[in-house]
Amino acid sequence: MKYSTVFTALTALFAQASATAIPAVRSPLAPRQSTTASCANSATSRSCWGEYSIDTNWYDVTPNTGVTREYWLSVENSTITPDGYTRSAMTFNGTVPGPAITADWGDNLIIHVTNNLQHNGTSIHWHGIRQLGSLEYDGVPGVTQCPIAPGDTLTYKFQATQYGTTWYHSHFSLQYADGLFGPLIINGPATADYDEDVGAIFLQDWAHKSVFEIWDSARQGAPPALENTLMNGTNIYDCSASTDANCVGGGKKFELTFVEGTKYRLRLINVGIDSHFEFAIDNHTLTVIANDLVPIVPYTTDTLLIGIGQRYDVIVEANAAADNYWIRGNWGTTCSSNSEAANATGILRYDSSSTVDPTSVGVTPRGTCADEPVASLVPHLALDVGGYSLVDEQVSFAFTNYFTWTINSSSLLLDWSSPTTLKIFNNETIFPTDYNVVALNQTDANEEWVVYVIEDLTGFGIWHPIHLHGHDFYVVAQETDVFSATKSPANFNLVNPPRRDVAALPGNGYLAIAFKLDNPGSWLLHCHIAWHASEGLAMQFVESQSSIAIGMSDTDIFEDTCANWNAYTPTELFAEDDSGI
């Protein structure tokens, strides 16, 4: 076996309508498959899914449900008051979070997205969805599409070949940090039984002005501490001593109500700008059954570390004394700052009529910026890494007028009007240097895999949540020491390592991820700290380039979106002033 690795080190470069936010309500996601199937999914048989089960290899097999689920999303400028402070925001259909998109494993999704913003393009990414056979719908401006121009509509179409918990969000600059996100839940089997599905619970930090107003300050170096946190789009901010007319009060805590003896499935999602949470519910144990879109062997914990973009599905049994309990976000104060870090809380009640605050005491948080231990994240479907290939790429850093991050000595800077996939469709083979393209092509029949190593050489000690589009990846190493191209690969875990689509790059360490070259496309890899992505901490893999154009099915729609964007840009009020993502 020839061992090779894609190696990248990380350095830093300094280069000078009205709607009220509402928390997502409980939505018991009842199984929708036929009850005449061989194995019905129920509270006592969650591993079943008709003719399929939790043991089915979903990378190779997708149910043919014959069902198409259609949704309409309007991207809007709105005025919202999620925590008692009124501010402008960007919303899907007027709310933060946006409406839930749900489907069953194997369903086809058709989602019409209309851009009703006055002065911005947009695009929607379906986080964690591999987009097999639908690469042009990954939703990244400058990579897989041109932005959707104001007044234009783009219809995204893809099949749900995976199942579990994820989210959709704008990938146009910093828009998701201004409210453009919502839950995407694909029903399927699970590794443990439960009675009720609570649905998505979002954790995030929240500013009291648009992040675009903060951007000029943020890119000068250390990002500012934001004013508050939200849990499922709501929280309380103390306006009692404020003279600010926008501080109107009236916020509320996110609440859950449990019935004693019932087991609940919670779908936890960190959609923060610059936040790391350690979720917990006082006096309750979390049974973790999935990370990102990968079912895992269940394990129990008192607290759960959740990086930006990551999702965990947990089961919580209502077995405590009937009382009120704090639901704790547990802000990672050693990872980033927030003015109301201690306020990242919600309330669990056993009596829905109760209105008093809990007096419960939580466990001591671990207080780390890391992921959950890799030893805990064991995929239920056991898969190994095969023969892989190597590319070594070094980096450098420089200082100019403002802060940017670099990968391979280059900070990502995309041209929204000329996405990578369009260049490939037009038979272009040379890409701009600041597109940060790494070509991946299988040249040896025994090397179907690539291992990509990203190493933090900045000395800052910041942990970065790294997200790859187009693939679940295998976490073969996640270390706080220095990577050695000659020695470190010998310690890679190639036997059923954790699989997911977001994993933390340790500060001053390295992250090694493996994935199979089985999905031709232009796939973005980036830090999911919003400031860092805008500051260029990203690159893209052009995988199996010769197969990309022939894999595109809706080329007319793809080209029409670019034509409409190019017709709009001469009147564009706000020019691109970040990486584009």
Swiss-Prot record:
Q: Which molecular-function annotations from GO does this UniProt entry contain?
A: copper ion binding; hydroquinone:oxygen oxidoreductase activity
Instruction: Cite the Pfam families for this sequence.
Output: Cu-oxidase, Cu-oxidase_2, Cu-oxidase_3
* Disulfide bond sites: 146-562
PROSITE patterns, per the entry: MULTICOPPER_OXIDASE1 (PS00079), MULTICOPPER_OXIDASE2 (PS00080)
Q: Which compartment or compartments is the protein found in?
A: Secreted
Carries keyword Secreted?
A: yes
Name the Gene3D superfamilies for this protein. Cupredoxins - blue copper proteins (2.60.40.420)
Source organism per entry reads Botryotinia fuckeliana (Noble rot fungus)
This one is known as Laccase-2
Q: Which InterPro entries match?
A: Cu-oxidase-like_N (IPR011707), Cu-oxidase_2nd (IPR001117), Cu-oxidase_C (IPR011706), Cu-oxidase_fam (IPR045087), Cu_oxidase_CS (IPR033138), Cu_oxidase_Cu_BS (IPR002355), Cupredoxin (IPR008972)
**How is its cofactor bound, per UniProt?**
Binds 4 Cu cations per monomer.
SUPFAM superfamilies membership: Cupredoxins (SSF49503)
Positions binding Cu cation 1 in this chain are 125, 467
Give the top-level enzyme category.
oxidoreductase
Record-listed E.C. numbers: 1.10.3.2
